[in-house]
Amino acid sequence: MPSVTDIFDRIYAGFIGKAIGVRLGAPVEPTIWSYERVRDTYGEVTQYLRDFKNFAADDDTNGPVYFIRALRDYGLDATAEDVGRTWLNYAAEEHGMYWWGGFGVSTEHTAYRNLRAGIPAPLSGAIATNGTTVAEQIGGQIFIDSWGWVNPGNPKKAAEMSARAASVAHDGEGLNGARFCAAAIAAAFDLTTIEEVIEAGLATIDPNSLYAGVARAVLAFHEQHPDDWRACRDMLNAEWGYDRYPGVCHIIPNAGVTVMALIYGQGELTRTVEIATMASWDTDCNAGNAGAIVGTMQGLQPGWDKYRKPINDFLVTSGVLGTVNITDIPSFARELTVLALRLRGEEPPALWLEDFERRGLRFDFDAPGSTHGFRTEPFNQIALKGSTAKHTETSRGSLEILLDRLERGQGGRIFWKPFYRRADFDDERYRPMFTPAVDDGQVVRFKLWLDPWNGDGNLRVAPYVKRAISDRIQETGAWHVPSSTGWQDYEFTVPDGDGEGVEEVGILVEYFGRLKFLGRLYLADFSVAGPGKVVIDPKREVQEWGGITRFTWNRGHWTLQNGRIHAHTAGDADAWTGNAYLRDVTVTAEVTPLAGKSHLVSARVQGTSRFYAAGFEGDEAVIVKEDHGTTILARAPFKPEMGRDYKLALTVTGDKLSLAIDGKDVLTATDATYRYGAAGLRMASAGRMSVGKLEVVDR
């Protein structure tokens, strides 16, 4: 049975493998990139086909990050219906998360519409509901990696759980794909050859299925032609090609490519994802699935570096939780390890349980070679890598910062980005949305250790934050020369930003000596913790990603007009901000009802369908709970005037909720359903409202 450390390391390696495969395959995913066109244009793929400022969101990685949250929200025995609720809860309607290709065309779009219409899973994805073509597209296997990772060494259970999860949108051969890929990942924790891993996956599906048939055809061809994957690809095209299977992206031809990449890649990650990419068809899906399996089996390897370094432990997702969308891969691997241990009936480490719902950040650099997404500016004289040369008592590693021949007055920034804007990306794939993961008032702590090689030692550092809209840099402490004899502790409080979000948090470095400085600076135990304050002044925000900076949104039209937020909707609509794990807070907003009956603020928001809200509903003031349906927790007569400004304040402390209007307490209620969540604005029905300043203050 794998140890806790081995589980964590292999999940981390597997997710890196998934991310590498998706990033490598994505540029040639569109169907216009035929097999012949990829071959003639790129020949042998041995590196990324495109450089990215930051790789934007992708449905292949959205699903593994978000759908596993069913185990958080509904427990370890979550049903297919629970996973269906999870789909609804974390996806904004028709932007982000899925390929919104149309009802009856996109399997995920179809399932989402069914769920919205009240058809529960697994009926939402059943052949009886949607027909065989829609039910057997490739999505059955591309979202399920996490179900394998939380079942290390238990392929049978991984297959069962993944099939339940996949049944939200898929059926038939689609479920076979889910079983195979998740079981192969689970088996990869224990097995040492790719042949064994493939057989473990196939053992969980019907041997007479088409999925097993195409896999066996590939394995048989490999026995006869072990050195010619292109001949195998020709066989797949002739006998199992797209012309034989209807729909936009059927699972069977792509299953053949996935197994082909696995067996011809011979258990080596880079070759596996390269074959999956060169083979065309659904390149990011196939390379992503194969990369997840092989990455888990192989574990981290130095030979991955050309693909691993650009990822930098950073992944963008595009659900409705803006801080979750800034995914730190080692931290997510730790979350999955907690779930894996719970499913095995074991108690996770106490600190990891805190991480599971942490209102803040903790980067320990414990995963081999991990960087936690830290960055440098400028790039040419400062370089980063995960290192084991120095570490603290609680970690196997630290961040090694190479400072290469700095002259007097030269330096730069070493930082983590808690917020992203449109300019940080080359495209708008899957429309990610972000809210800052670091807030004013929170405390930042870290350790530094200087290892000077050359120079007169006068290298100084100072902590800082950078603001998101103005690019203003705020130094938050005096300049110091770091210790060269051991770890030195640093601590600062994020200063008031005058209503502007935090885009960078880190350290400034500058050399004040006469001789050129060459050496290393090590950073360890970086954390952001404690209560904070979110202040959003609409005058300081801009419109991006179809919404407003520092907000995620679902339905309605959210714009900036005359220095205020303007919301307009024909049904329900929400906009959210703040950390996904806020607990006891007061959410205050300057709200002006303009039309309609519903004008609310929200707290402990865990998605589109799980939150508390309070404010005006018709001729009443209300406190409500939303849990895929509305429960009124408290109500009182109150008829708001259209066009008049009101200050709404919703306070949640423990299981106590209260609403104040213009500073006067109006309602109280008690409910213990939600312990944490983001905050925001809501209209539960058609109408318009204008909103001025919004504040979210930890209590």
Regions found by a protein language model. Give the residues of each.
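Extra-cytoplasmic beta-strand recognition segments
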Residues: 365, 420-459, 490-494, 526, ...
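Extracellular glycan-recognition regions
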Residues: 362, 372, 381, 463, ...
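An N-terminal structural lobe/cap that precedes and organizes the functional/catalytic core
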Residues: 2-66, 83-84
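Accessory "access/gating" subregions that flank catalytic or transport cores
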Residues: 112-135, 144-155, 163-168, 182-280
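Catalytic cores of secreted or luminal carbohydrate-active enzymes
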Residues: 323-414, 535, 541-544, 582
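Acidic catalytic motifs of isoprenoid enzymes
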Residues: 51-134
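Short carbohydrate-recognition loop motifs
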Residues: 386-427, 554-573, 620-623
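Catalytic phosphate/nucleotide-handling subdomain of diverse soluble enzymes
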Residues: 20, 24, 31-43, 170, ...
